[in-house]
Curated annotation (Swiss-Prot):
The keyword Membrane belongs to this UniProt entry's keyword annotation: yes
Entry function: Core subunit of the mitochondrial membrane respiratory chain NADH dehydrogenase (Complex I) that is believed to belong to the minimal assembly required for catalysis. Complex I functions in the transfer of electrons from NADH to the respiratory chain. The immediate electron acceptor for the enzyme is believed to be ubiquinone.
Enzyme class: translocase
E.C. designation(s): 7.1.1.2
An example molecular function term from Gene Ontology annotations: NADH dehydrogenase (ubiquinone) activity
Membrane topology qualifier: Multi-pass membrane protein
Recorded catalytic activity of this chain's protein: a ubiquinone + NADH + 5 H(+)(in) = a ubiquinol + NAD(+) + 4 H(+)(out)
GO cellular component terms, semicolon-separated: mitochondrial membrane
UniProt cross-references to Pfam families, sorted A to Z: Oxidored_q3 (PF00499)
Taxonomy of the source species: Eukaryota, Metazoa, Cnidaria, Anthozoa, Hexacorallia
Superkingdom, taxonomy of origin: Eukaryota
The gene coding this protein: ND6
Protein name: NADH-ubiquinone oxidoreductase chain 6
Length: 202
């Protein structure tokens, strides 16, 4: 029964992810993104990691997806040409190498995960991985404490890398708001709510 639930939720997550990038309406894309987040949270609950599942629902569904929805509602999408509708001219072949590179990276990660988790024991010993069939770190500690121990001991470099990525994203947002030629002005350091919410050109 658990296996059936796992495959059902996995299929739902993958299908929702496909619908996110294939839906023509941006609001529908956000809806399918919320479905993908909820399916992923259900998978974590099924695995017994309830803390990450709750964080998925609170942060991704309650904050990020709603933020995407507000951004889509504030954008004037009628200014963009409907590239994927009938008669639209869109050449997406330039993105094929990027898609292949990202797909290869994901498949390599999946293969590495199989060697660590489900592969022969000799590979697990060579890679220095845990025997996840007997998750001692989830049995000895609460899952929040186990995640903290793993995050700040063995995966500390990933934590530092994420902090640098967030710093770059923050600096990029500041640079984008100082874009020259915008309606607010090239050197504006304040918000003009009327200009931001107005659909007409000022």
């Amino acid at each position: 029964m658990v296996t059936m639930y796992f495959f059902t939720l996995s299929f739902g997550t993958v299908a929702s992810g496909i619908m996110v990038i294939s839906a023509l309406n941006p609001v529908h894309s956000v809806f399918w993104l919320v479905v993908a987040f909820i399916s992923s949270a259900a998978l974590f609950i099924l695995l017994g990691v309830d803390f990450i599942a709750l964080m998925f629902i609170i942060i991704y569904v309650g904050a990020i997806a709603i933020l995407f929805l507000f951004v889509i509602m504030m954008l004037n999408l009628t200014d963009f040409t409907p590239a994927f509708r009938r008669g639209g001219e869109a050449d997406m072949t330039n993105y094929v190498p990027i898609g292949l590179a990202v797909g290869t990276l994901f498949f390599e990660a999946i293969a590495s995960s199989w060697l660590i988790m489900g592969g022969p024991y000799v590979y697990r010993g060579l890679l220095g991985a845990w025997d996840l069939a007997n998750p001692w770190f989830l049995k000895k500690y609460h899952n929040i404490e186990a995640i903290g121990r793993i995050l700040y001991t063995d995966c500390y470099y990933l934590f530092i890398l994420v902090s640098f990525i967030l710093l770059v994203a923050m600096l990029g947002a500041i640079v984008l708001t100082q874009e020259i030629g915008t309606e607010i002005g090239p050197t504006a350091k304040k918000q003009d709510i009327f200009v931001q919410t107005s659909r007409a050109q000022v």
